[in-house]
Amino acid sequence: MELTLHEARVIGCLLEKEVTTPEQYPLSLNALTLACNQKTSRDPVLDLSEAKVQDALDSLNKKRLISEQSGFGSRVVKYKHRFCNTEFSELQLSNAAVAIVCLLLLRGPQTPGELRTRSNRLHDFKDVLEVEACIKQLMERDKPVLAQLPREPGKRECRYTELFSQGAEQINAASLSADSPSADSNSLNAQDRQQLEARVTQLEEQVAKLKDKLDSLIASLS
């Protein structure tokens, strides 16, 4: 499964609204567009037209990841996901797992602490350990749906990303580059780099002075 940014946003919104506002689910095109363009709980914030959202819906329909529904006496078409936990989906997830995947689709890579804080309307995690346990399960599936990203400089927690809109090869490449010495040096900020360069210069000067003293000592003994 490979989702574009717009497709991932649509699926994330459908997953979210199914849980948080079940009385309004399935969603009309207008309601779904508003959900996609929310200023809060979205990263990045988008400004999609209804036409763009419809394009994403058409594409998802071809992938059999959404379905259309029309109510009796209503001409308004509404949309529901077939992403997981349906008779048509191979992906079966717990409520906790749905919450984590939904948040990652809507807000990009996040730490377990961030996921716990932001998931209160989707699922009640007791603590961060429960989030981490769920993440571990999702990563250890026969076909993993999450991956751990390299820890950012100065950060204590690693972030995790979903693999529906991020290729596993990209994640593996990022992990490999983070383990290499060049990645460590590239991660240094400008201030750290300047301090290191100043320290190297200072050490070089000290070595030069010691060499001069050693040469003088050798000359006096000969």
From Swiss-Prot:
Family designation: Belongs to the UPF0502 family.
Name of the protein in question: UPF0502 protein Shewmr7_1629
Pfam families per the UniProt record, alphabetical: DUF480
Highest taxon of source: Bacteria
